[in-house]
Curated annotation (Swiss-Prot):
Matching SMART domains: ZnF_GATA
Description of how the protein assembles with itself and partners: Interacts (via the N-terminal zinc finger) with ZFPM1. Interacts with GFI1B. Interacts with PIAS4; the interaction enhances sumoylation and represses the transactivational activity in a sumoylation-independent manner. Interacts with LMCD1. Interacts with BRD3. Interacts with CREBBP; the interaction stimulates acetylation and transcriptional activity in vivo. Interacts with MED1, CCAR1 and CALCOCO1. Interacts with EP300. Interacts with CEBPE.
GO annotations of cellular component type: nucleoplasm; nucleus; protein-DNA complex; transcription regulator complex; transcription repressor complex
PTM description: Highly phosphorylated on serine residues. Phosphorylation on Ser-310 is enhanced on erythroid differentiation. Phosphorylation on Ser-142 promotes sumoylation on Lys-137. Sumoylation on Lys-137 is enhanced by phosphorylation on Ser-142 and by interaction with PIAS4. Sumoylation with SUMO1 has no effect on transcriptional activity.
Function (record text): Transcriptional activator or repressor which probably serves as a general switch factor for erythroid development. It binds to DNA sites with the consensus sequence 5'-[AT]GATA[AG]-3' within regulatory regions of globin genes and of other genes expressed in erythroid cells. Activates the transcription of genes involved in erythroid differentiation of K562 erythroleukemia cells, including HBB, HBG1/2, ALAS2 and HMBS.
Annotated tissue distribution: Erythrocytes, and fetal hepatocytes.
Annotated protein name in UniProt: Erythroid transcription factor
Record InterPro entries: Transcription_factor_GATA, Znf_GATA, Znf_NHR/GATA
The organism of origin for this protein: Rattus norvegicus (Rat)
Region of interest called Interaction with MED1 and CCAR1, as start-end residue ranges on this chain: 200-330
Keywords: Acetylation, Activator, DNA-binding, Isopeptide bond, Metal-binding, Nucleus, Phosphoprotein, Repeat, Repressor, Transcription, Transcription regulation, Ubl conjugation, Zinc, Zinc-finger
Keyword Zinc-finger listed: yes
Gene3D superfamilies per record: Erythroid Transcription Factor GATA-1, subunit A (3.30.50.10)
Length: 413
């Protein structure tokens, strides 16, 4: 944004330099410069000093441009020169927007003439030299014209923001509405405005616990842990500190005796119809037969069922399958299959036929016989270990019927 009267920034024309000591120490020019808005600027422009007239004209042009931009319907801009009390509409924005107290008197960034001796004592580094004073006077013309390389000293008692906003009392909002900065945390006001209560070492008055997900209170106001508080709320008394002993195992109750067989050892104690204790065996017997268990069935030891699967049956089944596999081995590459016998059993090997030897039976295990339906037996070729694919060994045409079960020579391939 171009400001009229500030074209000297882009050209070789230097900024107005206040080198006259009378301008530095004089308060009349300063009072006329910041007293009553544009009227005071017009009065200052008619001053006899040419440098003061140039500075007043520049500030007046900047003020008018800022007023026109501030009232734009698109961009709402708060007055940048709100530190000047005489400018209309220049009340400190930050103080009335966030503070509930009265408005603080606006103050400028630059110290007044009366503060100069105290700053000289507080500034041992010599920052109150001519260069620093010229920078501060340039800031009076426009805050945007500050030299980027020059920063304000930390020892300078600045009581307002760079744009003249009042000292803001609350640490949670900055005068411009920005989030908290690191300077706000280091401010003494920030530490004083948040009084933090010291950590209390709570302890349950009943069990002495110091850690619990929820602290409760009894009727007298003492702290209770969550467990003790719930117990007191449900039962109306304090929770016992010592856990009750677990119930003794039923089978090991001392002095318990079965009323039927007089045994003292059992896996489970039961009760009969009259409520007397009985052992597990007598109780189950009475439950199934509705009669007391006979004393002749009593045994000294406790008989338990073997719930593990026995391997005897598996061994017998494996041996039977091995014998059947040895009998199913073909001899000479052929197998005779009975198609339809008088007994109605289809798929049985013809009786009286010896199939292979025991040494070659393992080669054909897992290959069952081919079952065909028909009134008589059929002769089917069976693939041997050296004949290749089984599909190439079987005939594709119709199988001729025979009147008797016999073994013939192998078919020529």
């Amino acid at each position: 944004m171009d400001f009229p009267g500030l074209g000297a920034l882009g050209t070789s024309e230097p900024l107005p330099q206040f080198v006259d000591s009378a301008l530095v120490s004089s308060t009349s020019d300063s009072a006329g410069f910041f007293s009553s808005g544009p009227e005071s600027l017009d009065t200052a422009s008619s001053s006899t000093s040419p440098n003061a007239a140039t500075a007043a004209a520049t500030a007046l042009a900047y003020y008018r441009e800022a007023e026109a931009y501030r009232h734009s319907p698109v961009f709402q801009v708060y007055p940048l020169l709100n530190s000047m009390e005489g400018i209309p509409g220049s009340s400190p924005y930050a103080s009335w927007a966030y503070s509930k107290t009265a408005l603080y008197p606006a103050s400028t960034v630059c110290p007044s003439h009366e503060d100069a001796p105290s700053q000289t004592l507080e500034d041992p580094d010599g920052k109150n030299n001519n260069t620093f004073l010229e920078t501060l006077k340039t800031e009076r013309l426009s805050p945007d014209l500050l030299t980027l390389g020059t920063a304000l000293p930390t020892s300078l008692p600045v009581t307002s923001s760079a744009y003249g906003g009042a000292d803001f009392p609350s640490p949670f909002f900055s005068p411009t509405g920005s989030p908290l900065s690191s300077a706000a945390y280091s401010s003494p006001k920030f530490h004083g405005s948040l009084p933090l209560a010291p950590c209390e070492a709570r302890e349950c008055v009943n069990c002495g616990a110091t850690a619990t997900p929820l602290w409760r209170r009894d009727r007298t106001g003492h702290y209770l842990c969550n467990a003790c508080g719930l117990y007191h709320k449900m039962n109306g008394q304090n929770r016992p500190l010592i856990r009750p002993k677990k119930r003794m195992i039923v089978s090991k109750r001392a002095g318990t005796q079965c009323t039927n067989c007089q045994t003292t050892t059992t896996t489970l104690w039961r009760r009969n119809a009259s409520g007397d204790p009985v052992c597990n065996a007598c109780g189950l017997y009475y439950k199934l037969h509705q009669v007391n268990r006979p004393l002749t069935m009593r045994k000294d030891g406790i008989q338990t069922r073997n719930r593990k699967a026995s391997g005897k049956g598996k061994k017998k089944r494996g041996s039977s399958l091995a014998g059947a596999g040895a009998a199913e081995g073909p001899a000479g590459g052929f197998m005779v299959v009975a198609g339809g016998s008088s007994s109605g059993n289809c798929g049985e090997v013809a009786p009286g036929l010896t199939l292979g030897t025991a040494g070659t039976a393992h080669l054909y295990q897992g290959l069952g016989p081919v079952v065909l339906s028909g009134p008589v037996s059929h002769l089917m070729s069976f693939p041997g270990p050296l004949l290749g694919s089984p599909t190439a060994s079987f005939p594709t045409g119709p199988v001729p019927t025979t009147t008797s079960t016999s073994v013939v020579s192998p078919l020529s391939s």
